[in-house]
UniProtKB/Swiss-Prot annotation:
Primary location group: membrane
Keywords assigned by UniProt, alphabetized: Cell cycle, Cell division, Cell membrane, Cell shape, Cell wall biogenesis/degradation, Glycosyltransferase, Membrane, Peptidoglycan synthesis, Transferase
Record pathway: Cell wall biogenesis; peptidoglycan biosynthesis
Organism: Oceanobacillus iheyensis (strain DSM 14371 / CIP 107618 / JCM 11309 / KCTC 3954 / HTE831)
Localization terms from the record: Cell membrane
Pfam families: Glyco_tran_28_C, Glyco_transf_28
EC number: 2.4.1.227
Listed CDD domains: GT28_MurG
GO cellular component, one term: plasma membrane
Protein's name according to its UniProt entry: UDP-N-acetylglucosamine--N-acetylmuramyl-(pentapeptide) pyrophosphoryl-undecaprenol N-acetylglucosamine transferase
Stated role: Cell wall formation. Catalyzes the transfer of a GlcNAc subunit on undecaprenyl-pyrophosphoryl-MurNAc-pentapeptide (lipid intermediate I) to form undecaprenyl-pyrophosphoryl-MurNAc-(pentapeptide)GlcNAc (lipid intermediate II).
Length: 357
């Protein structure tokens, strides 16, 4: 039944800036809300959101954070200004009750436009330290929600709330037998899932493939490589490659025993909620602002994960860290059981309701 309420989501650039929105959208659909989403023209958010029934996707111009000199950097302020004007028109036409932002540079013009339109907005920050897009958006927003309790010290006290990680309910409905069928694995060895982030990782992909002879003695391997990064020349029993997995991910997770992954916040909190021991290989500081290193070290400190820095990644270091992770897995799972993710979705929706009052 329609209730005439409308929520507008934004966020993109990587899957991590979309996942929380994907967790919240079904909640509001079940309650009869109208749902809009503002993203970029060609970002991964378009691929993830456009196929959803009952969600209207709108594209706007957006800038990009580059950690290197480029003439494109000179154009970005104008792209953000154009995106703000586009978002201003969309918000004026769609008249949302509230805007929920998951970050990424596409979100900056949307949150700014919401402020200009007098529409309240809420930002969700997944990482241990706030990203640049969210930092730029904070002055325009009503509330900022933190995934890590430690993040609160980096946020304005009058706007910040700790809510924890919002996990998609569907991830808890996966079936191991379906995951094994999808991947074509037998399940007679521990299943190792390798993920290099939504875009894949050349370094992780290369090291995994170089180590296959030894790794396949101990594991069956599901390797999510990234778009265009599958190596069709490798055909080995117990090893399967995918560019990307979307709807079947819950079943792949259910078939998984151990994970090798980057250390994006949303992904590692999903592994935590599913009690999957993980070896984290965070993006280096040269390739990022260092947020994944901080995320990974936080999980290591809490004994949820083992960490291998990318600069130290070799066949030998990978094999030794995996062996240690495998031995420690029962202890890690016991530690993971102490973490409760069930209250996070409720906390977020209650804050959304309060901000709208």
């Amino acid at each position: 039944m329609k209730n005439n309420k409308r929520i507008l989501f934004t966020g993109g650039g990587t899957a991590g800036h979309v996942i929380v929105n994907l967790a919240l959208i079904p909640y509001y659909q079940e309650r009869g809300w109208e749902i809009d989403y503002i993203g970029s023209y060609n970002g991964i958010e378009r691929d993830l959101i456009s196929p959803l029934d009952g969600v209207t996707y709108h594209s706007v111009s957006t800038g990009k954070l580059r950690r290197y000199m480029s003439k494109e950097n000179l154009k970005d302020p104008f792209k953000v200004l154009k995106g703000t004007m586009q978002a201003y028109r969309i918000i004026g036409k769609r008249k949302p009750s509230i805007v929920f932002s998951k970050g990424g540079f596409v979100s900056v013009p949307v949150v700014a436009a919401a402020k200009l339109r007098g529409v309240p907005s809420i930002i969700h920050e997944s990482d241990y330290t706030p990203g640049l897009a969210n930092k730029l958006s904070i002055p325009f927003t009503k509330r900022v929600l933190a995934t890590f309790p430690e993040t609160m010290k980096y946020l304005p006290e009058n706007k910040a709330s700790y809510v924890g990680a919002v996990i998609r309910d569907e991830l808890f409905t996966g079936k191991r037998d379906i995951g094994l069928k999808i991947s074509g694995l037998k399940g007679n060895k521990p299943v190792l899932l390798v993920m290099g982030g939504s875009g894949g990782s050349e370094k992780i992909n290369q090291t995994i493939r170089q180590s296959l002879t030894k790794l396949l003695d101990e594991f069956e391997i599901i390797h999510i490589c990234g778009k265009g990064k599958v190596d069709d020349s490798i055909q080995l029993d117990g090893y399967v490659q995918f560019e990307y997995i979307n709807h079947e991910l819950k079943d792949i997770f259910a078939a998984t025993d151990l994970v090798i992954s980057r250390a994006g916040s949303n992904a590692i909190f999903e592994f935590l909620a599913l009690r999957l021991p993980m070896l984290l290989i965070p993006l280096s500081k040269e390739a990022s602002r260092g947020d994944q290193i901080i995320n990974a070290n936080s999980f290591k400190k809490k004994n949820y994960a083992r960490v291998l820095q990318e600069e130290e990644l070799t066949e030998q270091s990978l094999e030794s860290h995996l062996l240690e992770l495998s031995k420690a897995a029962p202890i890690i799972r016991d530690e993971m059981k102490k973490y409760k993710s069930e209250q996070s979705l409720q906390s977020v929706t209650e804050i959304i309701d309060n901000v709208m009052k």
